[in-house]
Regions:
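Bacterial N-terminal signal peptides
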Residues: 7-17
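Positively charged n-region of N-terminal signal peptides that target proteins for export
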Residues: 1-5
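Sequence-level preference for short, compositionally simple segments enriched
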Residues: 21-197, 201
């Protein structure tokens, strides 16, 4: 079983490496108006549904206060920042706010397949007020590279048991259950930082 799992994930990583090194059309998001769009969501919405050509959305340096959604019909998209310290996406919803519940508190939700995040930070700034998700992933074949995922309780939700996810050189922090969900995930050279005295189970 372990051999099968390793073979599967090595194949998964190889495919994404080839995918990442290929040149695709680029959409630019810049808060100063120098790009194609000012908001990340508008850039995502501009991508053709079930696009036959993968698209790269370059999010320039800035702090973006947005609740971002990549729906299931938006696939083959890469969100690429200028670096985890330079490109920051944040929101501040939490479970008891308007009784929204845990699974609607995300800052960024990914439901599309073959989505990649690179060189950026996703943060939920609600604070220690209970469940508050930063990144919510349900899509299949999702890769997250060189990113920071910041929050407190429930920072990263790896939703959907049929989802396969790859996290490479990421920094993930939180308190209670800050990585949770039924997906199959591989964490490669990631740093997990517990903000309180809790145990991490394997």
């Amino acid at each position: 079983m372990k051999t099968f799992a390793c073979t599967f994930f090595l194949s998964f990583v190889l495919v994404f490496s080839i995918y990442a090194d290929t040149a695709y059309p680029v959409i630019v998001v810049a808060q100063d108006g120098s790009g194609d769009f000012i908001t990340i969501q508008d850039a995502i919405n501009s991508v053709r549904d079930f696009t036959p050509v993968p698209r790269v959305i370059h999010i320039k340096k800035g702090i973006y206060y947005e609740k971002v959604e990549i729906p299931s019909w938006k696939c083959d998209i890469t969100l690429k920042g200028d670096g985890p310290e330079e490109t920051l996406i944040y929101y501040d919803d939490y479970a008891s706010l308007r009784r929204m519940g845990t699974f609607r508190t995300y800052t960024l939700q990914i439901r599309g397949n073959r989505v990649t995040l690179e060189n950026l930070t996703v943060e939920n700034r609600a604070g220690r007020v209970g469940q508050a998700v930063a990144l919510h992933v349900e899509g299949d074949c999702v890769a997250v590279r060189n990113c920071r995922l910041l929050g407190n309780q429930d920072t990263l939700f790896t939703g959907n048991e049929n989802s396969r996810q790859y996290y490479d050189r990421c920094y993930i922090e939180g308190t209670t259950d800050y990585i949770f969900g039924p997906a199959t995930c591989w964490f490669d050279h990631c740093i997990l930082h517990s903000l309180s005295l809790i145990h991490i189970s394997e």
